[in-house]
Design a protein with these regions (language model features):
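AMP-binding/adenylate-forming catalytic core of the ANL superfamily
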Residues: 1-63, 72-75, 80-89, 94
């Protein structure tokens, strides 16, 4: 099992990262894989490939997100909580198209 909070913790500790969310999306070969959605700190430039490469030094291969996206903001509900269900829906077709 992969625990999103563990991977998010590693990503959030990276230089230039303001916040991240990890969601599971369907994959034809693996059933489900992780996709990281990251917000950069103001003025920082993040490269998705650099984020996944940095994670390889700290995490087991099966825990590394298969894809990483840098976005301006994460969807939130009225309480301020990240709406991971919306992220799952947004990226659900990545590996099945």
């Amino acid at each position: 099992n992969v625990y999103p909070a563990e991977i998010e913790g590693y990503i959030n500790d990276m230089s230039g990262v303001a916040e991240s969310a990890l969601v599971g999306v369907p994959h034809p070969d693996f059933g489900e894989v992780g996709v990281a959605v990251v917000i950069a700190k103001p003025g920082a430039t993040l490269q998705p490939d650099a984020i996944t490469a940095a994670l390889k030094a700290s995490l087991a291969n099966f825990k590394i997100p298969k894809r990483c996206f840098v976005v301006a903001e994460l969807p939130r509900n009225t309480m301020g909580k990240v709406q991971k269900n919306l992220l799952r829906n947004q990226y659900a077709g990545l590996f099945t198209a």
